[in-house]
Regions:
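Glycine/proline-rich, positively charged
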Residues: 30, 98-162
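N-terminal binding-site loop/beta-alpha segment at the start of enzyme catalytic domains
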Residues: 1-92
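Short acidic, glycine/serine/threonine-rich loops at helix termini
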Residues: 94-96
Length: 162
């Protein structure tokens, strides 16, 4: 199997490379990653032909999304597919944040929010951090303990945005 061959995701019309690049490590998952190292890694992925990138607000409280914004500047927007996630809102705070999973976090309170307004705000905030005018795929992040609200509010909100 060629990891750089493209495959369509269902009947969406979106074609992604079989190998994608996930952004959790760039948010400081288990190890702090400097922006230069993250952007160089993403650029190396682009250089070898990777055209599917996944990130989330949760990954480093927005750091991963900002690093993708920096690394993908100048890359033809229609040449890649980018996914992010909803379900967490990032609210600035004066206090430094600590986390058992992500290191060196910016001062943000991370709040679960699967409401319609929360979904819309999450997408708008991600677009700003990513410096993009569109997100190709939006996943609901960790819906397990919020099943009813996800079904009643998050999914209908995402369906509106199709």
């Amino acid at each position: 199997m060629d990891p750089l061959a493209k495959a369509e995701i269902g009947a969406t019309g979106l074609n992604v490379t079989r190998l994608g690049l996930g952004g959790a490590p760039f948010g400081g998952l288990s190890e702090d990653v400097a922006q230069q190292r993250a952007t160089e890694s993403i650029a190396a992925g682009v250089d070898v032909g990777i055209r599917y990138f996944d990130t989330a607000p949760l990954y480093g409280s927005g750091k991963s999304e900002r690093y993708f914004a920096s690394a993908l500047k100048g890359v033809e927007r229609d040449s890649y597919v980018l996914s992010t996630k909803v379900g967490r809102l990032l609210n600035p705070t004066a206090d430094a944040q600590t986390d058992d999973v992500y290191l060196n976090l910016p001062p943000m309170d991370v709040v679960f929010d699967f409401s319609r307004d929360g979904i819309m705000r999450s997408i708008e905030d991600s677009l700003k951090r990513l410096e993009l005018d569109r997100i190709d795929i939006v996943f609901v992040h960790d819906p397990d303990d919020h099943h009813d609200q996800v079904v009643k509010e998050a999914f209908p909100a995402l369906a509106e945005l199709r």
